[in-house]
């Protein structure tokens, strides 16, 4: 959803912020 990362859920990022 934002910030980058390997995936997204409920509009929130999760995973490494690359």
Curated annotation (Swiss-Prot):
<keyword id="KW-0964">Secreted</keyword>
<feature type="modified residue" description="Leucine amide">
    <location>
        <position position="18"/>
    </location>
</feature>
<protein>
    <recommendedName>
        <fullName>Pyrokinin-5</fullName>
    </recommendedName>
</protein>
<dbReference type="GO" id="GO:0005576">
    <property type="term" value="C:extracellular region"/>
</dbReference>
<comment type="similarity">
    <text>Belongs to the pyrokinin family.</text>
</comment>
<keyword id="KW-0527">Neuropeptide</keyword>
<comment type="function">
    <text>Myoactive.</text>
</comment>
<dbReference type="GO" id="GO:0007218">
    <property type="term" value="P:neuropeptide signaling pathway"/>
</dbReference>
<keyword id="KW-0027">Amidation</keyword>
<dbReference type="GO" id="GO:0005184">
    <property type="term" value="F:neuropeptide hormone activity"/>
</dbReference>
<dbReference type="InterPro" id="IPR001484">
    <property type="entry name" value="Pyrokinin_CS"/>
</dbReference>
């Amino acid at each position: 959803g934002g910030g980058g990362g390997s995936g997204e859920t409920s509009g929130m990022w999760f995973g490494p912020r690359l």
